[in-house]
């Protein structure tokens, strides 16, 4: 088994490379951060620096030579950005990578998508994989849905390659550069966290190691009998209030911080004002309508299909994941001083 991991220099991809190296699996990693690439090489991975949005066939040939399994973790993930940027990174890059993977004989292609394509500014619990909103919440969600359509078309036209789509919800853990670090910065800098209705929303999260475990399961020969293009929700399997998650992080980081309850309409009004300023300055605002809304609405997933078909069960609990993440932040000097 030889695995190519895209988006390998941070987040999920970085954790995936570490997992595979520890298992003694031959790994080729790709990403844009060459400094991180050198660290991956020290771990035992082969690193090929590349920007998938600018990849050409000669680079793809080198990247995919000898690869039988591809974990496509690379994505432009943001609540803020242009349609062109999302299409380039999430749709076009996925299409070209998938076409090259088929051409070079990749047997398994695991595509990391997002449950953001479910979000519609309403409360939802135990969402199943076939749910679709009347319209997508933002350009990111639309682009991830479009990337799944690309995968579906490739799976129908190329039965020799098995495609699998995973939708992990709210990823977090070591090497995260977005969710937990931003939250920790706000806790330290402001001494309080503003949550709609005090954080009463019921949510799901996914520790990186659990998402990697799901990718590993989906790559096994036992799954070859499953339909190509199959989609699976992935979470920690623990519905929790947002407040309880934030409070657990506050406790583990030992930060003097309070959770303050604010009315959702007021926080949303502030976010919309910031968005208007952001459009004028072309900078991502500290708060967005989408970001604030994700804190307000119940949003949990049903992972029954992954449990029954992949044999997926989380290997790290939510509390363990928060504890491990807090320890990593402390040990690697990632906390504000």
UniProtKB/Swiss-Prot annotation:
Transmembrane segments: none
UniProt xrefs under InterPro entries: Epimerase_deHydtase (IPR001509), Lipid_A_modif_metabolic_enz (IPR050177), NAD(P)-bd_dom_sf (IPR036291)
A Pfam family hit: Epimerase
Family designation: Belongs to the NAD(P)-dependent epimerase/dehydratase family.
PANTHER family in alphabetical order: BIFUNCTIONAL POLYMYXIN RESISTANCE PROTEIN ARNA, NUCLEOSIDE-DIPHOSPHATE-SUGAR EPIMERASE
Name of the featured protein: Uncharacterized protein YbjS
Organism (species): Escherichia coli (strain K12)
């Amino acid at each position: 088994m030889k695995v190519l991991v895209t988006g390998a220099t941070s987040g999920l991809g970085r954790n995936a490379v570490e997992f595979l190296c520890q298992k003694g699996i031959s790994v080729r990693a790709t990403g844009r951060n060459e400094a991180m690439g050198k660290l991956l090489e020290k771990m035992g991975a082969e690193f090929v620096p590349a920007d998938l949005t600018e990849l050409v066939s000669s680079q793809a040939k080198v990247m995919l030579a000898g690869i039988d399994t591809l974990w496509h973790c690379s994505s432009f993930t943001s609540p803020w950005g242009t349609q062109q940027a999302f299409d380039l990174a999430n749709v076009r890059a996925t299409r070209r990578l998938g076409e090259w993977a088929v051409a070079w004989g990749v047997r398994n292609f695991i595509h990391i998508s997002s449950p953001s394509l479910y979000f519609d500014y309403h409360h939802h619990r135990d969402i199943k994989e076939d749910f679709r909103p009347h319209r997508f919440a933002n350009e990111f969600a639309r682009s991830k849905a479009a990337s799944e359509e690309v995968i579906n078309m490739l799976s129908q036209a190329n039965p020799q390659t098995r495609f699998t789509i995973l939708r992990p919800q709210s990823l977090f853990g070591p090497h995260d550069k977005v969710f937990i670090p931003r939250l920790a910065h706000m806790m330290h800098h402001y001494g309080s966290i503003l949550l709609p209705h005090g954080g009463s929303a019921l949510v799901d999260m996914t520790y990186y190691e659990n998402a990697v475990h799901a990718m590993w399961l989906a790559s096994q020969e036992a799954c070859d009998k499953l339909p190509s293009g199959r989609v699976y929700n992935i979470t920690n399997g623990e519905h929790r209030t947002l407040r309880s998650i934030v409070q657990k992080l506050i406790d583990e980081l030992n930060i003097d911080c309070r959770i303050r309850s604010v009315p959702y309409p007021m926080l949303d009004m502030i976010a919309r004002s910031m968005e208007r300023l952001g459009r004028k300055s072309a900078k991502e605002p500290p708060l967005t309508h989408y970001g604030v809304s994700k804190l307000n609405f119940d949003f949990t997933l049903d992972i029954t299909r992954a449990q029954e078909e992949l044999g997926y069960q989380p290997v790290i609990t939510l509390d363990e994941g928060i504890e491990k993440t807090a320890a990593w932040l402390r040990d690697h000097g990632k906390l504000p001083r």
